[in-house]
Amino acid sequence: MSHTLKSKTLQELDIEEIKETNPLLKLVQGQRIVQVPELVLESGVVINNFPIAYKTWGTLNEAGDNVLVICHALTGSADVADWWGPLLGNDLAFDPSRFFIICLNSMGSPYGSFSPLTINEETGVRYGPEFPLCTVRDDVRAHRIVLDSLGVKSIACVIGGSMGGMLSLEWAAMYGKEYVKNMVALATSARHSAWCISWSEAQRQSIYSDPNYLDGYYPVEEQPVAGLSAARMSALLTYRTRNSFENKFSRRSPSIAQQQKAQREETRKPSTVSEHSLQIHNDGYKTKASTAIAGISGQKGQSVVSTASSSDSLNSSTSMTSVSSVTGEVKDIKPAQTYFSAQSYLRYQGTKFINRFDANCYIAITRKLDTHDLARDRVDDITEVLSTIQQPSLIIGIQSDGLFTYSEQEFLAEHIPKSQLEKIESPEGHDAFLLEFKLINKLIVQFLKTNCKAITDAAPRAWGGDVGNDETKTSVFGEAEEVTNW
């Protein structure tokens, strides 16, 4: 539900007006956007009159201390109900009948806060590639300004996973136990590793290699979708594991629904051996003109493109394609399978992503991740910083996480004095923090009942607003999916 501003009121912006310059805002329902007058970024750059988006559930109590701050991950939004929905509701981890729950959108994200899609007041056009570097610490400081405007006196618990876990750690380290009472960090790290930095670089290079990138000065309606899609596919492989893909896909063909969709989209089948070979070779390659398979018949200079899904009909286990041989004879060819369910899944995810994200924003946020280091400009020894985090802390790691490894969670728990470490046994890798809802809910509920007892034991209050998604419902910003989509 909406919350009445109590002090230091920030100007609320008209979301409908912002949608005219940022079409992705329509994806987040029920959020608010306020204008923050000024912030000096870590880099020294001063930003003025910039937006911060947030969404709330529940009611702030008179003491202003029943606050849960939820921090979203890399491509998430302020809509916790979408990506952590099964944790949101009465008697769940995020209980709006007892807590005032708020999620603030990080800078660089395309979902309402200051980002490359924001209009630069000095130039009258979007910041685009001239968007200044914003760090995790910059986010925390900007978000603190918004919390102050809402009348928040202290945070009962800050909770986040992956990039959100970085924010949780910074909240605890920056403001101490008097303001941040408790902290939960899932699948994160004290500093961004060389492994993670390298993956971010590979994903950015995918975007840079797209000819439509244009140094970042592309029209929003013509962004480098091929590069952004490839970056997303690359990222997804780091979020899961080899075994999770093998169990889910093996060498199976795409679903019947996906094959039927491909057949509807296919303009015509190849009629020559050359076209047939070309179709297999270029399957998955797209250009603006990729609406059909163009036959080459050995002719130079003829445009040749392929649809991403055209090989579904060629590569199903029962397909027999009639083509003309190079000698002009017609014969039946049954090719070896070259199109698999795993490919269909990646292409589906790439297409889904380019319809909900912006390439410059992706670059900005991955660079934000690269800056994360709790010891940076504080001390030389990272353990020294962790020892200053005196809040009761719950560290949750995933045994199969290859991106933010379980050993990194052990390191956090070892050096944060009042911490407890919990392990999620899941084959899903890093994404388990967005999939293993029941276990995560149980762990957080237990932690809050122990450390926020005055709030969790209080009588529940009636509240209005949306509740979370069922865990089987497809999420816009999370990882819950309908398997028939691919």
Curated annotation (Swiss-Prot):
This is Homoserine O-acetyltransferase. It is found in: Cytoplasm. Keywords: Acyltransferase, Amino-acid biosynthesis, Cytoplasm, Methionine biosynthesis, Transferase. GO terms for biological process: homoserine metabolic process; methionine biosynthetic process; sulfur amino acid metabolic process. Pathway: Amino-acid biosynthesis; L-methionine biosynthesis via de novo pathway; O-acetyl-L-homoserine from L-homoserine: step 1/1. Residues 66-436 form the AB hydrolase-1 domain. Commits homoserine to the methionine biosynthesis pathway by catalyzing its O-acetylation.
